[in-house]
Amino acid sequence: MKTLLLTLVVVTIVCLDLGNTANTLFCDNSNVPSIRTRKRCLKNQKLCYKMTFFTPGFGWTQIKGCIHRCPESTPNEKYQCCSTDNCI
């Protein structure tokens, strides 16, 4: 009986943990356009983003990753956000 109870507890913990990871967003974390690096976002980060900005001498540069809300674009920084896995 103790073994059955212990087994049920372990199965419950594993299932709950899998449920939490199923709701986790994955975003591309690479700053190189031709390379994708998958990164698991934190629970409060529900968006993937790409920020593009101009750097004198280098041209347009991008930074990608996870974020909790999408900032507004400015003339010098352009943001794109989306809410599905590896969407940017």
UniProtKB/Swiss-Prot annotation:
Q: Which CDD domains match?
A: TFP_snake_toxin
What are its GO cellular component terms? extracellular region
Q: What is this protein called?
A: Three-finger toxin 3FTx-2
Top-rank lineage group of the source organism: Eukaryota
SUPFAM superfamilies, alphabetized: Snake toxin-like (SSF57302)
Protein role? Binds with low affinity to muscular (alpha-1-beta-1-delta-epsilon/CHRNA1-CHRNB1-CHRND-CHRNE) and very low affinity to neuronal (alpha-7/CHRNA7) nicotinic acetylcholine receptor (nAChR).
List localization entries. Secreted
Keywords, sorted A to Z: Acetylcholine receptor inhibiting toxin, Disulfide bond, Neurotoxin, Postsynaptic neurotoxin, Secreted, Signal, Toxin
Its family?
Belongs to the three-finger toxin family. Ancestral subfamily. Orphan group II sub-subfamily.
Q: Is Disulfide bond found in the keyword set? A: yes
Q: Which GO terms describe its molecular function?
A: acetylcholine receptor inhibitor activity; toxin activity
Top-level taxonomy: Eukaryota, Metazoa, Chordata, Craniata, Vertebrata
Signal peptide bounds: 1-21
- In Pfam terms, one family for this protein is Toxin_cobra-type
